[in-house]
């Protein structure tokens, strides 16, 4: 008990000059926790001793761990443009400025300006998406997983949905197509084999209980070698003949203006829409906007989705709608430079090399400019890469990777060397990167 009295008052810890740079609420929160934990340890072992400096060190470590876990701006030097762990697509500052007036004010989110009555939150965005994709109707939910669930639950609940075994995919976070189908209330009917599915497999599987054929884009892996699948066009011809629904879960879809290294054999959303009744894809992947599930297709099916009570749970907020709408308008105005994902994907080698040389000339550290390859990321185009330039450092790669990470720079290890890939590094981050490099090398 006497040892407990030796603990300094909480106010003494909170007001210590060593913690002065931290927010008061964090000092108070962690001081109480650390003192409480130390007292518990002391009650178990009376030989322990905690000095003022011991307590301050523990509080500092706890606050630092807490702050490092908070959202923070990073420099993406991995070369992976749509980096799932680093926030996928980013929003251009000009797009952000356009949305500020809507986000920071009251708006006509669900208010019809002509009638003065309640309106639909989807109207403004839907109007622009329909022009961009030349589709009958559209709907937006909070992500593509929600889109898949809503479509299956609305259009095929308690009915059979046919899909190829080669498309029973798993994406990040253990999101598996078969389990989603089960949760949505549909009966999965698998056809074909892992490496081969033929048109006759679909034809034989269709019966009076069949409601839909689901085709899923294998966006995060690729089959090579002895492999065969049925095209979306062939499936759509069959579904029209059999009067059932064709749904394409695209996952990550590109709209316009994509690098020639990537576009080969990769159909656009517009092209795919010609060969299915309904499709869905992510807003924050190749489309280059914020997280959302964008659903396009026949009006009669979209209208059914809008009547499902689940939509209330899956709907997007005004901030998401504003960002998506401004991105869509940027596409319509052909302002591709205002969509960072597109810009980074389409940057030519001279632009990338120029960024790398700018850094190399500004730092007094030995490094080598090398040609390399970047990836798209975001579970998109796994078998394709883009030419790039990197700065390669000779020091211990893993140690250097950790040092840069602590400075907010995320690079990669390649052939035993730590490298910074300049395809994914933003122009606005170059000076910040110079400062980080100098700090890492104490230059």
UniProtKB/Swiss-Prot annotation:
One of the record's GO molecular function terms: L-seryl-tRNA(Sec) selenium transferase activity
GO-annotated biological processes: conversion of seryl-tRNAsec to selenocys-tRNAsec; selenocysteine incorporation
Enzyme kind, highest EC tier: transferase
GO cellular component, one term: cytoplasm
Record EC number: 2.9.1.1
Family: Belongs to the SelA family.
Role noted for this protein: Converts seryl-tRNA(Sec) to selenocysteinyl-tRNA(Sec) required for selenoprotein biosynthesis.
Identification of the protein by name: L-seryl-tRNA(Sec) selenium transferase
Organism the protein comes from: Campylobacter lari (strain RM2100 / D67 / ATCC BAA-1060)
Gene that this sequence comes from: selA
């Amino acid at each position: 008990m006497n040892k407990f009295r030796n603990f300094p008052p909480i106010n003494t810890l909170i007001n210590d000059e060593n913690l002065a740079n931290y927010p008061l609420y964090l000092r108070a929160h962690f001081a109480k926790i650390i003192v409480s934990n130390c007292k518990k340890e002391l009650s178990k072992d009376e030989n322990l001793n905690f000095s003022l400096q011991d307590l301050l060190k523990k509080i500092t470590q706890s606050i630092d761990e807490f702050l490092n876990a908070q959202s923070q701006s990073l420099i993406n030097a991995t070369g992976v443009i749509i980096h799932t762990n680093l926030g996928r697509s980013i929003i251009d500052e000009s797009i952000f400025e356009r949305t500020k007036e809507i986000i920071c004010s009251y708006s006509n989110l669900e208010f019809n300006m002509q009638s003065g009555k309640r309106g639909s939150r989807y109207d403004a965005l839907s109007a622009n998406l329909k022009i961009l994709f030349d589709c009958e109707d559209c709907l937006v939910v909070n992500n593509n997983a929600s889109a898949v669930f809503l479509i299956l639950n609305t259009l095929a609940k308690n009915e059979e949905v046919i899909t190829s075994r080669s498309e029973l995919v798993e994406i990040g976070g253990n999101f598996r197509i078969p389990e989603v189908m089960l949760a949505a209330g549909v009966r999965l009917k698998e056809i074909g084999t892992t490496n081969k599915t033929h048109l006759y497999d679909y034809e034989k599987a269709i019966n009076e209980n069949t409601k839909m054929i689901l085709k899923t884009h294998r966006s995060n892996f690729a089959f090579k070698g002895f492999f065969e699948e049925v095209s979306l066009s062939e499936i759509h011809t069959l579904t029209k003949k059999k009067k059932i629904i064709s749904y394409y879960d695209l996952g990550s879809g590109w709209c316009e203006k994509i690098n020639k290294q990537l576009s080969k054999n990769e159909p656009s959303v517009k092209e795919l829409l010609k060969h299915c009744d309904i499709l869905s894809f992510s807003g924050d992947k190749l489309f280059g906007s914020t997280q959302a599930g964008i659903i396009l297709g026949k009006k009669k099916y979209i209208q059914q989705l809008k009547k499902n009570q689940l939509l209330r749970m899956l709907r997007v907020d005004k901030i998401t709608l504003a960002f998506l709408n401004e991105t869509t308008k940027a596409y319509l105005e052909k302002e591709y430079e205002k969509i960072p994902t597109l810009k980074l994907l389409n940057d030519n080698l001279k632009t990338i090399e120029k960024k790398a040389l700018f850094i190399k000339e500004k730092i007094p550290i030995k490094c080598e400019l090398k040609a390399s390859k970047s990836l798209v990321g975001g579970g998109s185009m796994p078998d394709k890469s883009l030419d790039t330039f990197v700065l390669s450092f000779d020091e211990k790669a893993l140690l250097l990777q950790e040092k840069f990470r602590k400075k907010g720079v995320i690079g990669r290890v390649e052939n035993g060397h730590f490298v910074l890939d300049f395809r994914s590094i933003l122009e606005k981050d170059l000076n910040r990167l110079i400062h980080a490099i100098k700090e890492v090398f104490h230059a």
